[in-house]
Amino acid sequence: GSEMCIRDSHVRERGPAVWALGQSISIKWNAHHRAGEQMSWRPPDTWDPRVTVAANQPPLLVYPIRLSYLDAIQRAQHRILINTPYFIPDQQVLEALLHAARRGVDVQVMVPEDSNHIVADWASRGFFGKMLEAGITILLYRASMIHAKTATVDGIWSTVGSANVDRLSLGFNYESNVVVVDRDFA
């Protein structure tokens, strides 16, 4: 069969945010293992408020990635750039993007022209009409299957991680995103 080329994005993290990534792993591990198999962790030695980790914890009904996206979208004044392989937003995320575009924010969403999940492609296309009517630019990436999950708002807020802008990633799955508030990074 034919092989699909995949385009992805990654970050290499150092410093206090590494602690937060480790903590999110240990919370998941410890929830599913007995006392003698628990992972220990200790608080970080320092803090860096510019770089944080948003890690969903489904058993606790904690979904900070979605809240981080909503906060950034609602604060946007100039530009929102979203890159995701599967774009199936819930109503609140969709409305926040539509509202941003209607108030003059340049909203651009890049998805693969053809992903590795045709049903997700069909579901994604169902949002395009409303988005185009509101003035949102939809970019279909053709060079490969884009698997990157990144966003940048106003050249200052950025996120890179495992969460798609879809209902599963933002409201059900274990996911982790690095959130960076820094113009040089954005």
Predicted regions and their residues:
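Charged, low-complexity intrinsically disordered terminal segments
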Residues: 2-3, 7-186
